[in-house]
Amino acid sequence: MQAVQQEIAQALKVQPPFEGAAALEQEVARRVAFIKGCLNNARLKTLVLGISGGVDSLTAALLAQRAINELRSETGDAGYRFIAVRLPYQVQHDEHDAQACLEVIKADEVHTVDIAPAVRALAAETEALKGGSPSLVDFVVGNIKARTRMVAQYTIAGARAGLVIGTDHAAEAVMGFFTKFGDGACDLAPLSGLVKNQVRAIARSFGAPESLVEKVPTADLEDLEPGKPDEASHGVTYQQIDAFLHGQPVSQEAFDIIVATYRKTQHKRELPFAP
């Protein structure tokens, strides 16, 4: 492991690879206990999470629902609830995957909020967007989508006295692959420190189908490039990112891309700047 790999892995609190099924089960139990502790410390009983159809939100939701189930069982209090939220922009092209995730999760409640009217209204009223290039406008509006989704989740959490769960993990954090105050905003991040293949392993341990576990990850925020794979944006694969974070050798090109992207996106991981 090179020094910079160790530095980054420590900063992101990257967890070591799972050494067998027992280690995986132990990590699942630890993260479920973390979620329960967050609720208890806040003296709240509700968790809220947006479900996209990808493995990250699927895995976070499975952990959350298990935590809620355990709290209900341990306390006898039926007031503990997990709310899964669908947040499509009009009609999502992979809505079938989102619905398949909901079938696996079996959330206590499912809410749906179409973010399109709010996103369009804000974009239409923003003078700075007028006259911008199509690609720039598309990118900025993509970030509006992410932030609107978080506004919706916090609206539900506020109405139901709950906490919002985030889906960020180490393989996304190292690349700064999240929107500031959008999907990067949350009250607790139960996937923190995990690499992508560990997120998949946890989902698989819950019995999630391989079609969802191995689905090609995509942020799907930009209309000009719908369904664009994360890896196309990264310039490296998640396999390479995972290997880097676990101190394993990667190609020099992948190494340079990951380190440069980590440094360039540091402002997203340390907010806000202060004198």
From Swiss-Prot:
Binding, deamido-NAD(+): R147, K180, D187, H267, K268
Its subunit composition reads: Homodimer.
Task: Please give the start and end residues of each transmembrane region.
Answer: none
Protein's job: Catalyzes the ATP-dependent amidation of deamido-NAD to form NAD. Uses ammonia as a nitrogen source.
In which residues is ATP bound?
G50, I51, S52, G53, G54, V55, D56, S57, T167, K196, T218
Q: What is the protein named?
A: NH(3)-dependent NAD(+) synthetase
Instruction: Provide the alphabetized UniProt keywords.
Output: ATP-binding, Ligase, Magnesium, Metal-binding, NAD, Nucleotide-binding
EC number from the UniProt entry:
6.3.1.5
Q: Which InterPro entries is this protein grouped with?
A: NAD/GMP_synthase, NAD_synthase, NH(3)-dep_NAD(+)_synth, Rossmann-like_a/b/a_fold
Q: Name a Pfam family for this protein.
A: NAD_synthase
Q: Name one GO molecular function term.
A: NAD+ synthase activity
One cellular-component annotation, GO: cytoplasm
Associated pathway: Cofactor biosynthesis; NAD(+) biosynthesis; NAD(+) from deamido-NAD(+) (ammonia route): step 1/1
Annotated family = Belongs to the NAD synthetase family.
Q: What is the lineage of its organism?
A: Bacteria, Pseudomonadati, Pseudomonadota, Gammaproteobacteria, Pseudomonadales
